[in-house]
Design a protein with these regions (language model features):
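Membrane-interacting alpha-helical segments
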Residues: 2-150
Length: 150
């Protein structure tokens, strides 16, 4: 009996390249998952050298922001090459405007988790992935209304 090869649906990949809403959110979420995971590992390794909760939260925000910015720029440039660098700056501007909310939620929740005795790396993951979910929802609603995703 002959078996047919397994075929994976290409719909998500097609949507990634054709839908701005899906593309921008996928790039940001992937960049934030990568940056949050890397930051959690870095903070967990450095925790003994970071003297206070405030120092941990501050270093977390700086490391996470730097990694996220670099990863997103690479992903967005790959997926939107035809739109040029100005499109990258336009989307990054929206991210920078929303960054205070992202880091207020992420840092605030991380600080509370540290105060509750949660390990630093786990606190980073919970706090910053929660912040991503909140800010992505707000940005998506704004982007649909403002025309960013057209």
């Amino acid at each position: 009996m002959r078996t047919r090869p397994v075929r994976f649906p290409m719909e998500p990949l097609n949507r990634y390249k054709t839908s701005r809403l899906w593309n921008i959110n996928a790039n940001i979420v992937l960049a934030d998952i990568v940056s949050t995971s890397a930051t959690a590992l870095i903070i967990q390794l450095l925790q003994s050298k970071l003297t206070t909760r405030l120092v941990i939260v501050t270093v977390t925000a700086i490391v996470d922001g730097t990694i996220s910015l670099a990863v997103f720029a690479g992903l967005h440039t790959y997926a939107n090459r035809a739109r040029g660098i100005t499109d990258l700056f336009r989307v990054q501007l929206h991210r920078w405007i929303l960054s205070p909310l992202h880091y207020l939620v992420g840092s605030g929740l991380q600080f509370m988790l540290l105060a509750a005795g949660v390990r630093a790396g786990i606190g980073v993951l919970v706090a910053y992935l929660s912040a991503v979910a909140i800010v992505r929802t707000i940005h998506s609603l704004y982007g649909k209304k403002s025309g960013l995703f057209h």
